[in-house]
Amino acid sequence: MSNFEMAGTGSSRNNEEDNQQNTNWVWYKHTNNNLSTSHNNQIWQQPSLDLYPGQIDVCDMTTSSRSLTISCQECGNQAKKGCTHGRCRTCCKSNGLHCPTHVRSTWIPIAKRRERQQQLQTPTSNPTGGSGRVGKYRDINQHATLDSSGLEMGETRFPDEVSSDALFRCVRMSGTDDGEGQYAYQTTVGIAGHLFKGILYNQGPENKSMRSTQFYENPPRS
């Protein structure tokens, strides 16, 4: 019995060694596959580059759609997008580099920016105060002087007051806010050799203190 047990014990040890060898063979085979796979990955994988300030990784631009911030190679500020030298406008100009992206500057001084913001924030009021329309007026760049005889601008002198016959045509103005329209009168007059056109809007009932104006439906034409 003891010999039989010893033989069985020896056979079991041999089986364990065979299993261990088989296990080791399978484990080494799996390791070789990993090595071959990693070797293939190393062949196809592109090496990473050390980027200096102002350089762009071309691989990131083709594979990523996020916006990149480019720094100037000299001062470290934000460089102009599309600059081939990788510098800002000031550094390109100081070094004498001809860059097409730095030809025109989009920088606006802070004084002009504040003035523009104040103009946008200031509402334009209607001088007549009638139907709440916002009038748009063009600034006159030429210097004008006003005296007792009228307004003089350049070589043209405009009278202070004009009394002339004009034809007023009744037109219907459509409203954009409420959809309801109103009636107005359109006229064209010539003063001092210049043509003036305008529209008279309805300002409500006539005030008795105002000087009445006599209108003709069909005024005589010269």
Curated annotation (Swiss-Prot):
It is found in: Nucleus. Expressed in cotyledon tips, leaf primordia, hydathodes, stipules, and lateral root primordia and weakly at the edges of petals and sepals. Coiled coil: none annotated. InterPro entries: SHI (IPR007818), SHI_C (IPR006511), Znf_LRP1 (IPR006510). Residues 118-128 have a biased composition (Polar residues). Keywords: Activator, Auxin biosynthesis, Auxin signaling pathway, Developmental protein, DNA-binding, Metal-binding, Nucleus, Zinc. Zn(2+) 2 binds at C72, C88, C92, C99. Zn(2+) 1 binds at C72, C75, C83, C88. Its main location: nucleus. The keyword Zinc applies. Residues 72-99 bind DNA. It comes from the Eukaryota. PANTHER family: PROTEIN LATERAL ROOT PRIMORDIUM 1 (PTHR31604), PROTEIN SHI RELATED SEQUENCE 4 (PTHR31604:SF26). This is Protein SHI RELATED SEQUENCE 4. It comes from Arabidopsis thaliana (Mouse-ear cress). The gene is SRS4.
